Regions:
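Nucleotide and nucleotide-moiety/phosphate-recognizing core
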Residues: 52-143, 149-173, 357-360, 365
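Small-residue (G/A/S/T)-rich helix-start motifs and N-terminal tracts that mark the onset
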Residues: 2-95, 102, 195, 206-373, ...
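Internal gly/pro-rich beta-alpha loop/helix module
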Residues: 137-138, 143-236
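Short, solvent-exposed loop/turn segments at secondary-structure boundaries
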Residues: 104, 151-152, 184-185, 414-417
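Short, flexible loop segments at the rims of nucleotide/cofactor-binding pockets, characterized by
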Residues: 116-121, 147-151, 319-324, 347-350
Length: 558
């Protein structure tokens, strides 16, 4: 779909937005109503915003609008009348006659559209529906709205499958029908949209899990001047980060540097079973810009690791017979951490008495620390799977970044058997940890299809990566990137979630670059690590250009 006109105030063509839970969106609607923008007026504006987006698209003359029983369908009825008044050929497909619609508001606007002469087809069989769709230039989906969850029931399941099979471009109103706007799950039939015009603000399900595959381009329609303030008053559950927000964490380009001023990183990782994890993490830290990387590994694998990383000093420390860290390694590791700007612990360590002792020692140190992979599993063992009930473990005088995927996160908060299965659930679990701690020195990076960087004050959602990141060792690369960024930050930096989010975006860009070389299914962790340096440059250049452009826009004209 291509658009031919600039956006009006009713449509905001940006991705970066506060994200509200569905129940809080209802509170925003009620708040706007109290400020004089009634629910019926919001429906009128929502339908108008959807119609406005359709009218921006090129080569669209005939529009099929599929409506449901509720207010989402009401938006579609409003859009039908607006489009017809602008000369479009419009056909509304409804499950019932207008007078049989249960929602009072939707019934009123449906009757209005009927009185205006909009063509209405009620409950067509699949063959007739396919004929309507095939003769249309675009489908406007207004069947199931933000209150939907579960699997679509007839006739909507059949209609959804028919729309997807028709091959006609689709614009969804608020949310693609069949998708949960809260969880991002779509267990049954679900519209695959080319664009989604969502009202008031983003919802978690639009940007996570199946939502990423079915929403297409997302356009937010604020609908009212008061919306921004009202959304903020309802405490967004998360925030999508825009590139310009990274200006404070982008390192200025200067030749007045040395290897230590770029930050020194210690990586404590590896075992005889997983030596590659240490290699991936250390290489990623170096590629991400750390000037000096030291790798501490069990002495039994040190020669093997050193052959893989000739540029990185490899320190072999005390090991058990099974090739894992011994508790006796703690003094050496703590001394190395004391000399480093930041430390990463966990990749490939395994979970043993010795590794638990090493992780515990580092947690109790004053080293800025990133804990990943088995380091997190060691933390789970230290706290009996309830890190949120042991805030003294994470309450320290130095930055601490935890980078769990959903299963690791579940093990940390007593949900090992039922790990978080959505962005919403991951946010809730991560907040149990950071709110128990209560300090600004802790950030939980809840990795998933939509990764959340959760601090005590806010949860940030970086631009997500592609499926190329779903490969063994990819998380080790991310841990190295975040540790390198942490190492070069000033001591007084307070926004750990923003640093972590930038690291996630570097990781995503590196994965995309690797996919161009090896294919989306052929990428290995080492390929991602090799692209990290160029990914950092690409993102930093983009951020710098945005900041420079914004500065030029603010300069007074002569």
């Amino acid at each position: 779909l291509t658009s031919e006109a600039p956006a009006s105030p009713g449509l905001r063509r940006i991705i970066v937005q506060p994200v509200l839970n569905v129940e809080d969106v209802k509170a925003v609607e009620n708040g706007l109503s109290e400020q004089g923008v009634s629910i019926s007026e919001l429906m009128r504006r929502a339908g108008g915003a959807a119609a406005e987006e359709v009218m921006r698209l090129e080569d669209v003359h005939a529009v099929a609008i599929l409506v449901g029983f509720g207010n989402n369908g009401g938006d579609g009825w409003v859009a039908s009348q607006v489009l017809q008044s602008h000369g479009y050929s419009v056909t509304v497909v409804s499950p019932v006659e207008p007078e049989e619609i249960k929602s009072d508001l939707a019934r009123l606007v449906a009757k209005s559209a009927e009185d205006a002469g909009v063509e209405i087809v009620v409950g067509p069989p699949r063959e007739d529906l396919m004929e309507i769709l095939s003769s249309s230039d675009l489908v406007l989906d207004a069947m199931l709205g933000t209150g939907f969850h579960g699997e679509p029931k007839p006739p909507f399941d059949i209609w959804i499958d028919t729309v997807n099979a028709a091959g006609v471009p689709v614009v969804s109103i608020d949310v693609p029908s069949g998708l949960s706007a809260q969880t991002g799950h779509a267990p049954g039939a679900c519209i695959v949209a080319d664009e989604t015009v969502t009202m008031l603000c983003l919802k978690p399900g639009l940007i996570s899990d199946e939502g990423r595959d079915v929403t297409g381009g997302i356009i937010v329609a604020p609908l009212a001047e008061q919306t921004e303030r009202t959304v903020l008053d309802n405490d967004p559950t998360a925030w999508r980060v825009e590139p310009a927000d990274y200006a404070d964490v982008v390192a200025p380009h200067t030749n007045n540097v040395d290897k230590y001023s770029r930050g020194s990183v210690l990586v404590v990782a590896g075992s005889s079973r997983y030596p590659g994890a240490a290699v991936m993490a250390a290489k990623a830290a170096a590629r991400a810009g750390a000037g000096y990387v030291t790798l501490a590994v069990p002495v039994t694998i040190a020669p093997l690791i050193q052959m893989q990383l000739p540029e990185v000093p490899v320190v072999g420390v005390a090991a058990e017979q099974d090739g894992t860290f011994s508790a006796a390694a703690r003094p050496v590791i703590l001394k190395l951490a004391e000399r480093s700007s930041a430390t990463l612990v966990g990749p490939g360590m395994r979970v043993t008495g010795g590794t638990v002792a090493v992780v515990s020692a580092l947690i109790n140190s004053k080293a800025p620390l990133v804990v990943d992979a088995d380091g997190l599993n060691c933390l789970a063992r230290l706290t009996n799977g309830h890190l949120d009930e042991f805030p003294e473990v994470t309450r320290r005088d130095a930055p601490l970044v935890l980078t769990p995927h959903c299963r690791e996160l579940g093990r940390l908060v007593g949900l090992a058997d039922t790990p978080p299965d959505s962005l919403t659930a991951a946010l809730e679990a991560a907040r149990r940890i950071v709110w128990a701690d209560g300090g600004s020195e802790l950030c939980v990076v809840a990795k998933g299809t939509a990764t959340a960087c959760v601090g005590v004050e806010a949860a940030l959602l970086p631009e997500p990566g592609t499926a190329s990141l779903a490969t063994a060792g990819s998380g080790d690369v991310l841990g190295g990137i975040i540790c390198a960024l942490l190492a070069r930050m000033p001591d007084d930096i307070e926004d750990l979630p923003l640093i972590a989010a930038f690291g996630c975006e570097v990781h995503a860009v590196a994965g995309s670059r690797a996919a161009k070389r090896y294919g989306s299914r052929g990428v290995m962790a080492g390929d991602i690590a090799d692209e990290v340096g160029l990914a950092v440059d690409e993102l930093e250049d983009h951020v710098s250009s945005l900041v420079a452009g914004a500065a030029e826009d603010q300069e007074p004209s002569l």
